[in-house]
Amino acid sequence: MQNFRDYYALLGIPQSADQAAIKAAFRKLARQCHPDLNPGDRQAEERFKQISEAYEILSDPDRRAEYQRFSRYWQQQGAASVGSDDDYGDFPDFDIFVDELLGRRTVERSPRRSARRSAATSSALSRDLERSLEVDPKTALQGGSAQLQLEDGRLLEVDIPAGIQAGEYLRLRGQGIKGGDLLLRVQLQASNFQVQGSDVIYTLNVSPAMAVLGGQVTVPTLDGPVQMKLPASLRSGQRLRLAGKGYSKPSGDRGDQIVVIQLQLPTRLSPEERQLYEQLRSLEQSR
């Protein structure tokens, strides 16, 4: 089968990998090829889609088992083994199989195909519902809850585990269609904190006087405000680092917060400020 995808190879894990290993492998690869970190890179975008698909299937025990049965079937050149109920002849294309496995489409099967597999697969998968869930970076790091309004009017309160990454899925049992599951793909909300891998980017507006002289300032972080000493002679775009104030890593450690300096020129001046700027200009011109 030409378009078959080996999900274990995509994630770089053995077929015996447990759920923790699958999750860790996905997190590592997702940070490397996330579209936000590779703007305009089509290869990275396609790679991210593939590893997300691999994680979506391998992280679910039922889907993983179905995928492995499908793999064995086609490795045997489409011949169902004696005494086996598995017959995947209705799926000549791997993408069609994945679409049904993820509930994207329903494939009409021959009535002679396995009744056990047909009933179990189409019944279970056709009822799952997939939606996106936006979570602010602070809640994603520390854990908490988020609300989601569904099309049918239901308002769900979703528990967010601490350290969840963009692209990961949360499964709500029984909240899909006709008792199926609701799969929520986590997306980080746009905010003053931009998560890039395990680092967090924050832009700090700095006055001309503070940029020239430096000094103590209060900087917001995901953990709350902290004091930071700015060096003198700062440039707009210069980056400073707050160690350990970034996002969580699979190891449990934290990345850093990168503070990007943005020079903020005053739009209105008091008489005293204008006088001081005029004096400064005179000094500069007399050099």
UniProtKB/Swiss-Prot annotation:
Listed InterPro entries: DnaJ_C (IPR002939), DnaJ_domain (IPR001623), DnaJ_domain_CS (IPR018253), HSP40/DnaJ_pept-bd (IPR008971), J_dom_sf (IPR036869)
MF term (GO), any: unfolded protein binding
Main location: cytoplasm
Gene3D superfamilies: DnaJ domain (1.10.287.110), Urease metallochaperone UreE, N-terminal domain (2.60.260.20)
Cofactor (UniProt): Zn(2+)
Residue ranges occupied by any J domain in the UniProt entry: 6-71
Biological process annotations from GO: chaperone cofactor-dependent protein refolding; DNA replication; protein refolding
Pfam assignment, any one: DnaJ_C
Domain of life per record: Bacteria
Subunit-level organization: Homodimer.
Family: Belongs to the DnaJ family.
The protein's name in its UniProt record: Chaperone protein DnaJ
